[in-house]
Amino acid sequence: MNQHTPAAALACAGLLGYCRAGFEKELAAELDDIAAEAGLIGYVRAEPDSGYVIYETFEPTPLGSFGESTDWRRPVFARQLLPWFARVDDLPERDRATPIVEAVKASGQRFSGVMLETPDTDEAKQRSGFCKRFTEPLAKALEKAGCLRSSRAGLPVLHVLFTSATTAWLAAGQPGQCSTWPMGIPRVRMPSNAPSRSTAKLSEAFMMLLEEGERDSILRAGQRAVDLGAAPGGWTWQLVNRGLRVTAIDNGPLRDSVMATEMVEHLKADGFTWRPHRPVDWMVCDMVEQPSRIASLMAEWVATGRCRYTIFNLKLPMKRRVEAVEQCRELIRKRLASVGPYDLRIKHLYHDREEVTAFLTLKR
C-alpha cells in the first residue's frame, strides 16, 4: 500500500448500528432520521431479532460527509454506531483473513487497531470464542499488509462484525465518535453484596451517560442524593458505594445490607409527592410508572433546582417505544423552555429491557 486515504475521504457505504435483539425497528427509525439530517440518500435494512441494523447509501459517501451523524451517543437504541465501508461474503473456513485484508487494502485506509465482534444474540455469541482466537492472526495479517499502524494516534479502529460464520461487515470507528467497549457493551461487575441486580443498571448508566471526566467532577463522595422508589435498595446501594449520602424514598422496605451502611435515611413516602427541604446534588428514580409521569417529575425537580443532576428510568410500551421516548423529550423541553438550556441524554442500556435510562441537568 503506497497510497493511503485520509480518514475523512474513506468511501463509506452507510451506517452500521448494534442494538439489543428485538429493537431493530426502533434503531432503524432513528438511523433513517439521522441519515436524512446528514443529507444521506439510501435505505435501511433490519432483520427482526438480529441485533444490528444497516443503513446503506445508494452511492459511496466520503466519511467526512457523515459529520456528527456517526456519533454513537445520538441514537437512543444504538449500543454502537459506525460508518461501514465493505461487506465480505463467502469467507472460506480455512482462510478468513485474506479476503478481509484485501477488502481493507482496497479501501486505502489505515487503522490504529482492530476489534472483532458479533451481534448480541444467542446464535451469534457462539462465534465469540472464534473472534478472540482470530483477533491476533488478523491483526498480524493487516499489519503485514500495511493496513495497521497502532502507533498512529487519530486513526480509526477497524471493526469487523461477523453476522455469520461466512459474512463480515467492515466499519471504521472514529476516535470520540464510537463506543470503545466491544459490541458497545460496558463490562459491569455485579457485586455479591448488592441488594438487587438493578444496581448494575445504575452503574452502567454512569458509564454510558457520563463522560469519563464528568464522572470524576459531578459524581463525588460526600454529595447528597435522593432515590425515589428506592426499595429494595439497588440504586441506593450504588450511590452509597460511591460515597454519597442518600435519602431513600419508598413505602416498601430496604434490605438490611443497605441500611447497615449508616449512610442512608429511609423515609416511607410517595416518590411523586415528597420533596426535599433543601436542594441535593443527585436524584435518581427507577419507579414503575407511565414514562410521561416520570419525565414530568424529573423535569420539575431540575427546573425548580431541587437537584442538579438526575438519572432516571422510563418504562416503555412495547409497540410505541420511539413515540414514548419522543413524548418524554417534548414534556421535558416544554417544562425547561423558560428555565434555560439543558442537557438530556437517553440510552437503551445493556441492563435495560423494555425501558430506557436518561440523564438530565441544566447547562451551566
From Swiss-Prot:
GO terms for molecular function: S-adenosylmethionine-dependent methyltransferase activity. Gene3D superfamilies: 3.30.2300.20, 3.30.70.2810, Vaccinia Virus protein VP39 (3.40.50.150). Keywords: Cytoplasm, Methyltransferase, rRNA processing, S-adenosyl-L-methionine, Transferase. GO terms for biological process: methylation; rRNA processing. Catalyzes the 2'-O-methylation at nucleotide C2498 in 23S rRNA. Pfam families: FtsJ, RlmM_FDX, RLMM_N. It is found in: Cytoplasm. One of its GO terms (cellular component) is cytoplasm. Monomer. Its main location: cytoplasm. This is Ribosomal RNA large subunit methyltransferase M. The gene is rlmM. Belongs to the class I-like SAM-binding methyltransferase superfamily. RNA methyltransferase RlmE family. RlmM subfamily. It comes from Thauera aminoaromatica. It catalyses: cytidine(2498) in 23S rRNA + S-adenosyl-L-methionine = 2'-O-methylcytidine(2498) in 23S rRNA + S-adenosyl-L-homocysteine + H(+).
